[in-house]
Amino acid sequence: VTIRVAVAGATGKMGRLAARLIDEADDLELHAGLDSRSNLDELEGADVVLDVTHPAASPAIVEAAIDAGMAVVVGTSGWSRERIADVERRLRDLDDAPGVIFVPNFSVGSVLGSAFAALAADHFDSIEIVEAHHAGKVDSPSGTAVRTAELIAAARGEDGPVAAPHADQRARGQLVSGVPVHSMRMAGLLADQRVVLGGEGETLTIQHTTIAPTAYEKGILLALRRAATAEGVTVGLDALLGLHLPGTR
């Protein structure tokens, strides 16, 4: 069975990458490619919509796709837990609701790095995240850093927030689920994240660096293929990889 995919954000870097992957895959078909000038009616007839647009445009695209009964893979950053919960409620109101998969990062290595941090979280007193991306990235902290912080907090459970001395000082970063996150945006980078965990007499650093967009290919294809039969809301590529992490769905 061929899965017809509409790519919203088709002229961006991720959109162009996805379109090429879809063209090369035997089981996928590029149904439509939308940019900022396109009408959302162009989504009609797709089985799956891939949203790799902009935080301001993403909600309307997701809403239109859901209302039309199309599955959605959301690769756009900026979706808070509250907004994702709104999507869940919207799906519950539909008799034959499609699946929606939110993917903060399509890189398998990055997702595994976040999983390793969650696994280690309960064994260290202090945890902080330092993430760096290219100058064109519009949101900070990154969706990957937010997702990592949420996984860390869920793994620690009743142990309370991560120890973060003087976290009220601006230079200490933004607290996300109790974890200080420091963001850098600069030329010469694509994507890099370090999770630094500190305990008595030792530190552990879990680092992932994306050096080329090809790192996203496996995750994009996996999400598109799973979306066609997905139910409800799925958050994170980790669930599609079979990683059973605390607080995941």
Protein language model features and the residues they cover:
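Alpha-helix C-terminal capping/helix-to-coil transition sites in glycosyltransferase folds
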Residues: E44-G45, V49
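Short glycine-rich anion-binding loops that position phosphate/pyrophosphate groups of nucleotides
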Residues: P55-A56, G78-W79, N105-F106, M186
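Rossmann-fold NAD(P)-binding glycine/threonine-rich loop
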Residues: E63, T76-V100, V108-V111, A115-L119
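Hydrophobic beta-strand scaffold residues
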Residues: L30, V72-V73, V100-F102
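Rossmann-fold NAD(P) dinucleotide-binding segment
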Residues: V52, A56-G75, I84-D86
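Glycine-rich phosphate-binding loop at the start of an alpha helix
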Residues: P55, P59, S114, T214
